From Swiss-Prot:
Keyword presence, DNA-binding: yes
Keyword DNA-binding: yes
Gene3D superfamilies in UniProt: 2.40.50.40
Activity versus pH, per record: Highly stable from pH 0 to pH 12.
Pfam family, one: 7kD_DNA_binding
Record lineage: Archaea, Thermoproteota, Thermoprotei, Sulfolobales, Sulfolobaceae
Descriptive protein name: DNA-binding protein 7b
Keyword terms, alphabetized: Cytoplasm, DNA-binding
Compartment(s) where it occurs, according to its Swiss-Prot or TrEMBL record: Cytoplasm
Family note: Belongs to the 7 kDa DNA-binding/endoribonuclease P2 family.
GO MF terms held by the record: DNA binding; RNA endonuclease activity
GO CC terms, sorted: cytoplasm
Subunit: Monomer.
Amino acid sequence: MTTVKFKYKGEEKQVDTSKIKKVWRVGKMISFTYDEGGGKTGRGAVSEKDAPKELLQMLEKQKK
């Protein structure tokens, strides 16, 4: 699977697209929630131009 690299609260993070639960658009940013493990949910955002195509495909699927 593909990984998404992003910054959250000044910290560089990356998450596998298979762990992403929900995706939505906020202006030119793509926001998402993902499973951190241990029952925790993480949040992240990446600019539309830096988003991998798999993340954009997930966004399109959720719109329908």
